[in-house]
């Protein structure tokens, strides 16, 4: 399942782990997603929403 917010479309960001010896390996920072039941067009729908959208009040919980 994709790590993408259903409200804003925010996805994972990519970068590098850098050790003390400066060994570089790839890594990714995933979005903090939460399963939520929300009202969309008057109907209840299960969505995976990032915590930024939850805190900003972009959706109405069912």
Swiss-Prot record:
<dbReference type="GO" id="GO:0006412">
    <property type="term" value="P:translation"/>
</dbReference>
<protein>
    <recommendedName>
        <fullName>Large ribosomal subunit protein bL28</fullName>
    </recommendedName>
</protein>
<comment type="similarity">
    <text>Belongs to the bacterial ribosomal protein bL28 family.</text>
</comment>
<dbReference type="InterPro" id="IPR034704">
    <property type="entry name" value="Ribosomal_bL28/bL31-like_sf"/>
</dbReference>
<dbReference type="Pfam" id="PF00830">
    <property type="entry name" value="Ribosomal_L28"/>
</dbReference>
<dbReference type="InterPro" id="IPR050096">
    <property type="entry name" value="Bacterial_rp_bL28"/>
</dbReference>
<dbReference type="InterPro" id="IPR001383">
    <property type="entry name" value="Ribosomal_bL28_bact-type"/>
</dbReference>
<dbReference type="GO" id="GO:0003735">
    <property type="term" value="F:structural constituent of ribosome"/>
</dbReference>
<keyword id="KW-0687">Ribonucleoprotein</keyword>
<dbReference type="InterPro" id="IPR026569">
    <property type="entry name" value="Ribosomal_bL28"/>
</dbReference>
<dbReference type="GO" id="GO:0005840">
    <property type="term" value="C:ribosome"/>
</dbReference>
<dbReference type="InterPro" id="IPR037147">
    <property type="entry name" value="Ribosomal_bL28_sf"/>
</dbReference>
<keyword id="KW-0689">Ribosomal protein</keyword>
<dbReference type="GO" id="GO:1990904">
    <property type="term" value="C:ribonucleoprotein complex"/>
</dbReference>
